[in-house]
Amino acid sequence: MQNLKFLIAAVSCLGPALAAPTPTSNFINSNFNKRASVEDSAFGYASLNGGTTGGAGGTTTTVSSYAEFTAAVQGDDPKIVIVSGPIEETAEQVDVGSNTSILGADSSAVLTGFGLRLKEVENVIIRNLGIAKVLADNGDAIGAEYSNNIWIDHVDVSSDRDHDKDYYDGLLDFKRGSDYITVSNSFIHDHWKASLVGHSNSNEDEDSGKLHVTYANNYWYNLNSRAPSIRFGTGHIYNNYYETVSDGINTRIGAQVLVEGNVFVDSKKALYSTDEGYAVERNNDFGDAKNEALEGTLTSVEYEYDLLDTSEVKSAVVGTAGQTLTF
């Protein structure tokens, strides 16, 4: 297995790299194929700004109904909420408090008909959880605004494409100055508008200098657009596997994105700019698509990460991304 490990100097995310990447051969990703622990550490941008620990050290509650779930995730005291089995309710997003870990016990932990809202909170972990078919009137599957330090890992988020593009809203949307977010090892599929970073061209005052988001080791499948779409922010997108995606990575309105080690199959637009968004791309396999983005300046990030060669991405991601953990 040929792998690259990057130890990056702590430099400005919008500036040029001050240190060249150092190749090594000791790739280890502890998130793959194992029983998970509440002590697992966030990586990517969620590891910065003091890190993201969720409800570590707090009380643990197991829930199996909508009423139990909504009660358990409230408040800002440290808490771990384990979802046991499916919960179905057509309702608006449930507000999640700070210092919270929401963990699906196994692959049956699926929320259907309602999503999660992270508003003016910090330090939230969501892992091994399924969220499906949240109607547009009820918000996103997972949405964050005015919030920071969020780790979304091994989730399965979807709707369908049988309805028009406005029947559902976003799957993973981050806006209004949210910051230090990682989306990893997740299955993002069967949807029109997958993941939006920065909701409006006119929101520069709130978003500029924020919206740092890592997307790592995710499986994007059967999507129309926003995989992801980033305005104003800073994105690091690596080792993702894209299959049957019409519009992939869209960098917009001054965004700076580092795109590396991703694979695109049966996809139309892999990487492109709108309104002067920028990208640096390295070692990607775009298949029949291509890079149509303006050249950017984001050549390094402020954390350590492991990078797979594109020949290894499919086997590492497909079948592993999504709800493949147990708690």
Curated annotation (Swiss-Prot):
Cofactor comment text: Binds 1 Ca(2+) ion per subunit.
Positions annotated to bind Ca(2+): D140, D169, D173
Catalytic residues, chain numbering: R226
Transmembrane segments: none
Signal peptide span: 1-19
Keyword terms of this UniProt record: Calcium, Carbohydrate metabolism, Cell wall biogenesis/degradation, Glycoprotein, Lyase, Metal-binding, Polysaccharide degradation, Secreted, Signal
Localisation: Secreted
Temperature dependence: Optimum temperature is 22 degrees Celsius.
Glycan attachment residues as annotated in the record: N99
Lineage: superkingdom: Eukaryota
Activity's dependence on pH: Optimum pH is 8.5.
GO biological process, one term: cell wall organization
GO cellular component annotations of the record: extracellular region
Catalytic activity: Eliminative cleavage of (1->4)-alpha-D-galacturonan to give oligosaccharides with 4-deoxy-alpha-D-galact-4-enuronosyl groups at their non-reducing ends
GO-annotated molecular function: metal ion binding; pectate lyase activity
PANTHER family: PECTATE LYASE 18-RELATED, PECTATE LYASE 21-RELATED
Annotated family: Belongs to the polysaccharide lyase 1 family.
Annotated protein name in UniProt: Pectate lyase A
Organism listed in the record: Emericella nidulans (strain FGSC A4 / ATCC 38163 / CBS 112.46 / NRRL 194 / M139) (Aspergillus nidulans)
GN (gene name): plyA
